[in-house]
Design a protein with these regions (language model features):
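Short secondary-structure boundary/capping segments
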Residues: 63-69, 172-176, 208-213, 230-231, ...
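Structured core elements
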Residues: 81-84, 116-119, 157-159, 193-194, ...
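Conserved ATP-driven motor cores of ASCE-family P-loop NTPases powering translocation/secretion/packaging/pilus
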Residues: 180-264
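Non-catalytic alpha-helical coupling and interface elements of nucleotide-dependent molecular machines
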Residues: 16-24, 34-41, 54-61, 83-91, ...
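Short, contiguous acidic/charged loop-to-helix segments that flank catalytic cores in large enzymes
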Residues: 125, 169-173, 217-220, 232, ...
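Flexible loop/turn segments at secondary-structure boundaries
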Residues: 2, 124-127, 165-168, 200-203, ...
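P-loop NTPase motor domains
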Residues: 1-180, 250-251, 311
Length: 345
């Protein structure tokens, strides 16, 4: 099934990151979103955004006093930045029906939870889009789910694989947003795990908000790698029974150092733990197995894209009406006033 998000849901900050815009161009994009809100225009897909950019550029003098300077150069740069995004699948990703995270909180007939797998093989080829999607997903969970306090077990747990992509080249304001979301999302009954090769891939401010840690073996030979191991060991609550720094480099296959939040809210001492292997296929499912799972998962509403009335259609109608009005005005007969001339006697 397709996973989609609307342009409005993604917002100007994340969209600016996806498009690699300059601060000046990001400012123009913020103006576009503000104009869309003020005019009641829905930005659902990329053609809506393109239509709005062209429309505002054509009428920029009408908006200059209220919203600030809008330069043709910046608008053109944003339009150019949309081209590679469309080529990389942005036309398919942005649109409706947008993902409703509530659809993931389901149980089967026996009351067991469901595992939802996001196939990001193609999406991950665009690391910036992949990271922005994950961040949007995290924010959507926080904003959508009601506050439920400290539950005995979470309603939903997310495992973000290749988490280093989420933070690579991320501006400070986005890292701060992730930190805030991770800090508060537990009260929504949501658990979040960042899965990555090294703890160093996750900023310290975000690591500080993560209560549960599972650290598999790290191999270190260079001074930089040894420092990373030391930092990883220091993230655990010390256990006098063994040295965590040495243990990380000695762990075998199926072993990990673990530490989880206790009932008193205090992280437990680090333990050397044997991990139970997954009771499933360690690899991609066969095509037939995958097809059967998709057929019975109840997510068929996401299969077909919807093209609802949005900014593209509204602005096209408005432009057509203006052109027809001009054409009528040009074709109307000229009204001549009667002229009386007084002649001398």
């Amino acid at each position: 099934h397709a996973v989609r998000a609307t342009v409005s849901d993604m917002g100007p900050e994340l969209l600016s990151r996806i498009l690699s815009l300059t601060p000046a161009q990001e400012g123009i994009l913020h103006i576009m979103f503000r104009i869309a809100d003020d005019k009641g225009l829905l930005l659902l897909d990329l053609k809506d955004l393109r239509a709005l950019l062209n429309y505002v550029n054509d009428h920029k003098e009408d908006y200059r006093m209220k919203y600030g300077n809008i330069t043709t150069q910046s608008v053109a740069a944003i339009l150019r930045a949309l081209l590679p995004l469309e080529k990389e699948g942005g036309e398919l990703f942005f649109g409706e029906p947008a993902l409703d995270v509530n659809d993931w909180i389901r149980t089967d007939a026996e009351g067991r939870g469901m595992v939802n797998v996001l196939d990001c093989v193609k999406l991950v080829q665009n690391p910036t889009l992949y990271a922005s999607f994950l961040l949007w997903l995290l924010s959507e969970l926080f904003e959508t789910m009601p506050e439920v306090g400290d539950l005995e077990k979470p309603k939903l747990v997310f495992f973000f694989d290749e988490a280093h992509m989420l933070f690579r080249d991320a501006p400070a304001v986005l890292v701060q947003k992730i930190e805030q979301t991770v800090k508060l999302i537990r009260s929504r009954g949501i658990g979040v795990f960042f899965v990555t090769q090294s703890p160093a891939d996750v900023p310290n401010t975000v690591l500080a908000q993560l209560s549960n840690r599972v650290q598999h073996a790290l191999r270190a030979y260079t001074p930089t790698e040894l420092k990373a191991v030391r930092v990883a060991a220091q993230a655990f609550r010390e256990n006098p029974a063994f040295n965590a720094e040495d243990a990380i480099m000695e762990l075998g296959v199926g072993e990990a150092l673990t530490s989880f939040l206790g009932e008193d809210g205090i992280p437990a001492m680090v333990q050397r733990t044997k991990i139970i292997c997954p009771q499933s296929l360690m690899g991609a499912p066969e095509a037939m197995t995958r097809a059967k799972a998709i057929l019975r998962d109840g997510m068929e509403k996401y299969d077909e894209a919807e093209d609802n009335v949005s900014a593209y259609e509204v602005l096209a109608d408005e432009t057509q009406a203006a052109e027809e009005a001009l054409a009528l005005a040009a074709c109307a007969p000229t009204a001549w006033a009667d002229i009386s001339v007084a002649m001398p006697a």
